[in-house]
Amino acid sequence: LIEAVRAAEALNGCIIPLMTKTASLSAIQSAITDEIFYALGLGRRGVLRRGLGWVFALPARRFARHMAAVDGAVGEGGPAAGCQVMLDRLGVRVGARGADRIPASGPAVILANHPGAYDSMAIGSLIPRRDLKVLVGKTRFYEALPNIHPHLIGTSPARGDSMLALRAAADHLSEGGVLLQFGSGLIEPDPATDPVGDEVFDRWPPSMEILLRKVPETRVVPAIASGVLLPRFRDHPLVRLRRDAMDKRRLAEFMQVIWQLLFPKSIDARPRISFGQPFRVEDAGGDTRRVMPLVIAKMKAQLEDHLRWSR
């Protein structure tokens, strides 16, 4: 669900859409309710979903209205505008460092860690390019967002889907676009509250090797986000009902975003985003087999620098 918010993008290149489409509030609300049940471990379909969906009508309706506004802002002003609309509605103030390191043109990948919540909204609000695309997990939610959905690169754990997504991402880069990619695609610990060990980076797939092999002129910008998932939600008793660590973080981030939408002034949220120096495959001696070790080394160095700056 949160990844849907992260997906605010503009059309490819500098093309401005001739008409902004209007999202259906009922379709968005239905999709949001599906995601509520999924976050709780109850499934997006079934008897419970059909019988108890009304219980979440108020927060789902409120979220739907906000998402419709974000979708409209993306259609009119591009990804940064859409991201900023949601951040404003959440009452979030972003602290940033190094945003001027993002290439103004040409193929580029913003490679980031993934603590969840609104990390990509915070990052997206700092990317001034209209050709931004985001790699996201497939879900019905996106289909209810007409100005966002056409500009996503959807993927899933299925090998066929992941390869198609990488091909689409490579095509976008070859056309000179910018891509926002989260290392593993899974929710990870927030560096502001939890240690980020080697095991986190060990889960990152070698997708950058594939992309840089196909588009070697791509510049990669390491980015670190922190301070997005607050301890009061991470440690909430309801979160303990989920066993898997990633499911716990998914539920915590969902609860936090819903709470902030309902009570935007009740939380002083100040995420921190930092960007490192861009690098290319030539920094690995032109050998794509050495790209992932270089990528991981750059991300670890950026994490250390980020923690020194943000504390």
What do these predicted ranges mean?
Residues 133-136, 180-182, 219-224:
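A structural signal for short, well-ordered beta-strand segments and their strand-loop junctions
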Residues 18-108, 118-122, 129, 266:
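Membrane-anchoring hydrophobic helices of lipid-metabolizing enzymes
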Residues 175-189:
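A structural motif
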Residues 189-284:
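A cross-family acyltransferase "interaction/gating" segment
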Residues 165-175:
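Short amphipathic alpha-helices and their capping/turn segments at secondary-structure boundaries
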Residues 1-18:
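N-terminal amphipathic/basic-hydrophobic helices that include classical n-h-c signal peptides
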Residues 114-118, 186-188, 228:
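Gly/Ser/Thr-rich loops at beta-strand to alpha-helix junctions
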